């Protein structure tokens, strides 16, 4: 998900989106007009700094075409400048008279103000971490340019013309500088005592070694360009040029990062939680506020997780017994389901292709059902791809990448197929509903296609975004999608249980000093997952403190607000209209979401 501060509006975008921008639908009141103009300025300021964001949004044309050959500045000076920019934006936004704003203008103001305030507080107190990611470490198994730039160049840098191919080479040349800047940022944090745990260093080096171990001419960075220029019949020795850049610029910079991480290994500790870092308890408290957009305390979240684990275990137990599974604990029975060959796709390329084909059938089936439950439907297409092999070792089981604003690049649901034993068939429906439709793709695309200002279209509040996706997993049950699929229903409950387990483990690791091994055992025992999958998940929570808590807290908020609207409106409650109310406003802090639902209730009561 793109960060609010990473990608903001350009003049080109203003022309492109004039028909959809709220400022253009009708003359705005003076203060609202000032607000929308300020939003446009904020967008332009950040787009100037984020070439990758420009490309991701499909805005690297016209006056911003030059940015297609650039990568963002990742230097320490630029990090300081970004922090100063946020303070400046907060000052300018605070000068707007909030009392003079109404409706969505007020909501938009509240959302951006919240984001600026939270970022300013974090920047002031903590002088370490990967800016804009929520991670305390600059280099880790889930983040860093060594991982993000190859994926970006392959999946988002479009190649249609010779200029596009030349821009690819320019970005490839800039990749080395980006890695060196990032290494210097990591060295800054290391001097403050911010060193990843030993297992994070090992996992990160494993992935870097895999990238570096490929001969330059066979690197995915080279093959991606070579394949696409051939498809477009673009003349020139692009493969040769790319291989030289990879061998002479990219690999040496990657080796410098690897050397740094290797130098940390002898003294790295095994403690998993951020409690051990400088001001670590406060860092975790701030992470929980930033990620969940609530004021819930670690102890409160931990207890909520334990209570949910117990109640959802009882639901799974009953469903399993009804389908002939009665021996052992719920976790042991889930383990048996993971091990049952009847639920496994062959761990071959053909088997993996069949798995993706089956997921596409599932997407088509639920897309046909959407008009019954949603008023506004996504226009942009969804495609399903494997997680790239060079990053699948440390990547999550599935994730979503938004499409471009113009719809030319579809939204993409990535599924990790490093081992099909980790994704048995009974786990796939709920994962697909979460990442695709009616989860992330529907929510993100409806926001992108809505009449919101662009700064709001790309707002990414995790508790809302992931809360919505988990809420839609529950919707699938209510839609009757599991009426004839008890195994898939168990999969849905398993994934709900996963989100409860995350509440327990995240707070356990970062507030209660759990070890990595304790967390892995609790995960595997409760959920029945293979230890390999449990390990990947737990190591993810170690580097993204608080993020794992967003899913269930967000889901419970959506369910509570839906019940609130049902109770208030009675026979006037319309699920389609409720979904429009909570989707067309874009991603929000949960407190602002409640304000939106209250306004929806008041409007429909009248």
Question: Which residues are covered by each model-predicted region?
Answer:
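N-terminal secretory signal peptides and thylakoid transit peptides that target proteins
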Residues: 1-15
């Amino acid at each position: 998900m793109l960060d609010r501060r990473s990608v903001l509006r350009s003049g080109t975008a203003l022309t492109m989106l004039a028909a959809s921008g709220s400022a253009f639908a009708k003359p705005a009141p003076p203060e609202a007009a000032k607000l929308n103009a300020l939003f446009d300025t904020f967008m332009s300021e950040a787009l100037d700094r984020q070439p990758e964001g420009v490309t991701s949004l499909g805005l690297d044309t016209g006056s911003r075409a030059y940015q297609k050959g650039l990568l963002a500045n990742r230097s320490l000076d630029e990090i300081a400048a970004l922090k100063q920019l946020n303070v400046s934006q907060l000052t300018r936004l605070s000068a707007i008279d909030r009392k003079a704003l109404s409706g969505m203008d007020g909501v938009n103001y509240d959302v951006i103000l919240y984001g600026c305030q939270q970022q300013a507080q974090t920047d002031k107190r903590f002088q370490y971490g990967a800016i804009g990611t929520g991670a305390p470490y600059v280099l880790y198994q889930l983040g860093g340019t060594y991982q993000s730039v190859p994926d970006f160049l392959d999946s988002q840098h479009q190649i249609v013309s010779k200029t596009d191919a030349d821009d690819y080479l320019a970005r490839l040349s800039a990749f080395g500088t980006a890695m060196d800047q990032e290494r210097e940022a990591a060295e800054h944090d290391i001097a403050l005592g911010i060193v990843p745990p030993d297992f994070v260093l090992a996992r990160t080096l494993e992935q870097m070694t895999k990238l570096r171990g490929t001969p330059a001419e066979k690197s995915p960075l080279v093959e991606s360009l070579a394949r696409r220029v051939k498809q477009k019949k673009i003349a020139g020795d692009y493969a040769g040029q790319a291989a030289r850049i990879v061998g002479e610029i990219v690999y040496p910079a990657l080796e410098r990062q690897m050397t740094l991480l290797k130098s940390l290994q002898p003294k790295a500790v095994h403690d998993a939680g951020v409690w051990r870092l400088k001001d670590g308890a406060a860092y975790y408290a701030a992470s929980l506020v930033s990620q969940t957009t609530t004021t819930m305390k670690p102890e409160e979240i931990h207890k909520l997780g334990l209570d949910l684990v117990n109640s959802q275990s009882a639901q799974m137990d009953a469903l399993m017994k009804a389908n002939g599974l009665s021996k052992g604990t719920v976790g042991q029975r889930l383990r048996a389901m993971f091990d049952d060959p009847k639920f496994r796709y062959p761990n071959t390329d053909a088997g993996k292709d069949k798995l993706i084909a089956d997921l596409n059938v599932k997407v088509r089936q639920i897309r046909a059902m959407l008009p019954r439950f949603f008023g506004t439907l996504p226009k942009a297409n969804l495609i399903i791809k494997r997680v790239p092999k060079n990053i699948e070792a440390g990547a999550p089981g599935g994730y979503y990448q938004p499409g471009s604003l113009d719809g030319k690049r579809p939204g993409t649901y990535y599924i990790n197929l490093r081992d099909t034993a980790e994704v048995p068939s009974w786990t796939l429906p709920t994962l697909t509903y979460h990442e695709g439709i009616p989860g992330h793709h529907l929510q993100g695309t409806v926001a992108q296609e809505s009449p919101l200002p662009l700064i709001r279209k790309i707002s990414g509040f995790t508790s809302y975004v992931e809360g919505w996706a988990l809420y839609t997993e529950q919707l699938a049950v209510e839609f009757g999608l599991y009426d004839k699929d008890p195994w898939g229903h168990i999969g849905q409950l398993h994934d709900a249980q996963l989100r409860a387990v995350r509440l327990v483990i995240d707070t356990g690791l970062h507030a209660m000093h759990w070890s990595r091994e304790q967390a892995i055992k609790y995960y595997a025992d409760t959920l029945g997952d293979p230890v390999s999958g449990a390990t990947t998940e737990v190591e993810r929570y170690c580097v993204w403190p608080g993020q794992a808590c967003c899913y269930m807290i967000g889901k419970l908020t959506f369910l509570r607000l839906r019940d609130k609207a049902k109770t208030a409106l009675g026979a006037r409650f319309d699920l389609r209209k409720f979904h429009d109310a909570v989707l067309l406003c874009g991603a929000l802090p949960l407190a602002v979401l409640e304000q939106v639902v209250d306004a929806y209730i008041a409007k429909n009561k009248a």
